[in-house]
Amino acid sequence: MPIPTLAEKLAWLKPSPATPYEKHCAAKVPQGDYEIGVQVTNDILDEAMEVFIRSSRSYFGVSGDSMVALFTAGGDLINASCGTYLHAIIQPIVIKFILKYYEKNPGIRDGDIWYTNDALYGGIHNPDQVALMPVFHKGQLLAWASAALHTTETGAIEPGGMPVSAKSRFEEGLNLPPIKIGENFEIRNDFLEFYSVYGLRAPAMFISDLRARCTTADRVRVRVLELVEKRGPGFVVGLMRKMCETAEAGALKKIKALPDGKFRAVVFNDAIGWTPALVRACFLTLTKSGSRITFNFEGTSPENPSSYNVHPQAVVGHIANFMYEYIFHDLPIASSTFAPIDFEFPEGIILNPDKMAATSCCVFIGMQCRNATHNAFAKMMFSSAALWRQVTAAPGSQHTSQICAGHSQWNLAVSDVLSFSLNTQGQGARSSQDGMDAYGFAWCAFGRAPDSE
């Protein structure tokens, strides 16, 4: 069973080297056409996000706590429309896994629909599920499209997808490695039947959100092919490669402007699941040198027999939430922005547990990694006369998920999380400015608050 190793995952986070064909195509894209092309990808993804919101059933789907993304043929992220940045940097792991292990059997073909939610293979936790579609033009693989969303039911030992009492992955319900769930642009009925068994507490919502992901990814595919028909495949390939290079150059410039040094931050949890416990949820040593940053988590507490463990790429996802909201706020959402950033995870810590570990409540530990990152960058930036005014306090843990299960007023089965209470939480203050009482969600800066009544 080729579960990707930590080394593979961290390598797949980085952009792949440009192929000779990509370099040739990128050199032919004029600057004016490049700027227009970038905006076209923005429009494609924003339209697909609107489709996603309107076709989803779960609260998080309707709220826009989701992401729609476009990738190169090799799996590198080049742009996205985000309610949340949580999935932004890590989805290339899934695509590159498919390319490495499944290219020949079962094969990658036009009209395929791939699906996954397993954190062992590059996800966050099993409620966060993603549909992916390859974009082919006359037999040539040009790109990939994806749609990711948290669906609050997985058939676990508790309703709501994040069982607090789970002690291993075998109590968390659906954990699906990357699998082909559709061919010839149709979802397979046998998979829908298999999938719905895990969503028996709320089957209509479960299946509706799956279909919403698939139709959203397909909308991106269709619009990209329209651009190909208008400008040619070479232009699209060159545009995406140039977007990768431009994003990386911007990230290098921003990182280089930060002060060099070592900056530490430690964040504790006072409980693990139902058990009071003092846990060093994140011990971060952040080293900034020139145009590179290294995150080292030596000193973090060991993994524990609960669902409060985090696989390494999920930690990176939480860090991406901070980076894109604050440091890279004006850069494209692209794999190449993380090219100058390295991660070191000691084996056996709560942020790099055994493959059997439960991780369904990983977000509550992952958020502490985001808070530690926030605090470390605050120390770094506060030492700079040019940057100290931009320092913002971390949003805190925001551990107030309200999960419910039962029957709606229409007597339909429901298992969901009430997103309106999450998407209206507070944001930290600056040194010269108050915080915000109702800013958004620490995991989703742009989510809505529907059905608050």
Segments from the language model and where they lie:
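Glycine/proline-enriched, intrinsically flexible loops and inter-domain linkers
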Residues: 2-110, 115-137, 141-453
